[in-house]
Amino acid sequence: SGFSTLVRLKEKEDPTVGRVMEWVKTNRTLASQIDSARVVMESMASEITPCAEVVYKGQAIDKNKFSVIPLGDPHIGLQTWSKEVGHDWDLKIAKRVYKKVFTRLLARSPDTEECVLLNTGDFFHADNIAGETSASAHKLDLDGRPSKWLEVGFQVMQMFIEMCLTKYKSVKFYNVPGNHDDILGAALGVFASILYEKNPRIEVFKGQSPFQYFHKNKVLLGFAHGHKCKLGALPGKMADDQYIMWGNSTHRHWITGHVHHNQWIQYKEWSGASVESVGIIPPKDAYAYGGGFGGRRGTQLIVFDDRVGEWDRKRESVLETD
């Protein structure tokens, strides 16, 4: 913070003050930057032409069951080199692999009337033209320019949503904020809400809150990225945020991302709720590979019965042929 002054050059004999303008410099918080960016994004998104209504081709069998598809940290824009980390990955590969894996997953999953499509955060790998995260300014391994990440990212988002709209009668898209893409992640939710505003079968939760909830009959689900709140504190957070839903439910569960692997060792039943983290499809970047982080690459679909909780779970792994 401080002052900046614009001055006018003057002759030595000129008695007038040379100051033309003075303004205060401030250190804006990340939150205020994101709020400003959201206003700009909503203005830009207003120019988007909403797409035509997607045709439903599914066969809903049991209205008591619903499907939840967690998109574990897609990291669109990530680039890796096989000689360094064991696998090649870029925008072109990401688009191809996501389509193949998601197609196989939906083909072997049961038809339910309702689907919850969940972005667990970090949909984009970086957040600005410098190729960094906005919150921590971490330098990242990236493929191409920001406009390319946006284009491919929105195409992948559209593919996920429209495949779900084709299979399920009702779709809810939850966009959870991550730690890699504070601004571009917010853009994803804004653009999706406008793109599908003429599709009455989808409801878009744009992602203003780091903690989001879905409630149906006796099941209460919580969604978070997992970088701000320790897993053990999430059940209490759910009870505090949604005390009415908490009291009306008997099966309560959190789904998080961030750690890039299925946390079955830490899949625990805390007081009143269970918590898990889901794996991801992209390979490890150089930082994660060097640190020995990460896990098996793949995704999953969880079927819940609104009377008894989790009913079934389908897994789909990334194949070498993908």
Segments from the language model and where they lie:
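Short, solvent-exposed polar/charged micro-motifs at secondary-structure junctions
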Residues: 16, 184-186, 213-217, 286
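N-terminal short leaders/motifs
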Residues: 7-16, 158-175, 252-261
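Core catalytic region of metal-dependent phosphoesterases/phosphodiesterases
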Residues: 54-57, 61-74, 82, 87-202
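Short, solvent-exposed loop/turn segments at secondary-structure junctions
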Residues: 75-76, 124, 180-182, 228-229, ...
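Conserved beta-sheet core of the metallophosphoesterase superfamily
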Residues: 165, 194-201, 208, 215-222, ...
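Acidic, histidine-bearing metal-coordination/catalytic regions of metal-dependent phosphoesterases
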Residues: 1-92, 99, 107-111
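Gly/Pro-rich turn-and-neighbor structural signature
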Residues: 177, 207-211
